[in-house]
Amino acid sequence: LSLGTIKKLLQILAQGLKAICNHRDLIAKGCQA
């Protein structure tokens, strides 16, 4: 894997975590902390 590919994968993971946080209020509070 190249660094660019790893960075893209990390971005996708971060976006996925944000989406989960946005859909669950309790988890969203935990993610913001």
Curated annotation (Swiss-Prot):
It comes from the Eukaryota. Keywords: Disulfide bond, Secreted. Transmembrane segments: none annotated. Expressed by the venom gland. It is found in: Secreted. One of its GO terms (cellular component) is extracellular region. The keyword Disulfide bond applies. There are 6 heterodimeric myrmexins which consist of a small subunit (SS1 or SS2 or SS3) disulfide-linked to a larger, quite structurally unrelated subunit (LS1 or LS2). Belongs to the myrmexin family. Heterodimer composed of subunit LS1 and subunit SS1 (U1-PSDTX-Pt1b), heterodimer composed of subunit LS1 and SS2 (U1-PSDTX-Pt1b), and heterodimer composed of subunit LS1 and SS3; disulfide-linked. This heterodimer may have anti-inflammatory properties, since the myrmexin complex (composed of 6 SS-LS heterodimers) inhibits carrageenin-induced edema in a dose-dependent manner (after subcutaneous injection into rats). This is U1-pseudomyrmecitoxin-Pt1 subunit LS1. It comes from Pseudomyrmex triplarinus (Ant).
